[in-house]
Amino acid sequence: MTDQQVRIVSLGDIAPNRRRGGDLRALLTPTTAGSTSGFMGVAIVQPGDRIAEHYHPYSEEFVYVTEGALEVDLDGVPHSLGTGQGLLIPQDMRHRFRNAGDVEARLVFHLGPLAPRPELGHVDTEDAEGNALPCDGAHAGHAAGHERPAPAAEVVS
């Protein structure tokens, strides 16, 4: 038997994070649910809205579209992702999401493994309006000699 407490978290329990665009809600995290290997959340993206380009130096990101459709740029290469489709975004791959449709899009995301500290897990490369941010090589995993690998991704219907 385990001593771990079961925690049910509702979308409405989590405040929206709009700093990167869209409405991002990290539902199941070390803080909210006691997770130790990753975290899961939901992104709600209105028509014409976007989630700014970023990458994760320690984690892969698994995404699954539950409603609507999104354009996702993977290291600058655009791909379409629709309802019922999933995508694995490799560690270190730059990515951004756009809702080019006319209905709300919802995306479930999971990242794992966790970064050594939360502030190291996410590197923004542009702001919510799409303006490039300076890239600090000492930021995130780069301080430990971490290098970005060559791009690779696959979208499967």
UniProtKB/Swiss-Prot annotation:
InterPro entries cross-referenced by the UniProt entry: Cupin_2, PKS_Associated_Protein, Polyketide_Synth_CurC_prd, RmlC-like_jellyroll, RmlC_Cupin_sf
Domain Cupin type-2: 42-108
Disordered: annotated span: 116-157
Cited SUPFAM superfamilies: RmlC-like cupins
Domain of life of the organism encoding this protein: Bacteria
Family under the similarity heading: Belongs to the SchB/CurC family.
Protein name: 16.7 kDa protein in whiE locus
Naturally occurring in which organism (per UniProt): Streptomyces coelicolor (strain ATCC BAA-471 / A3(2) / M145)
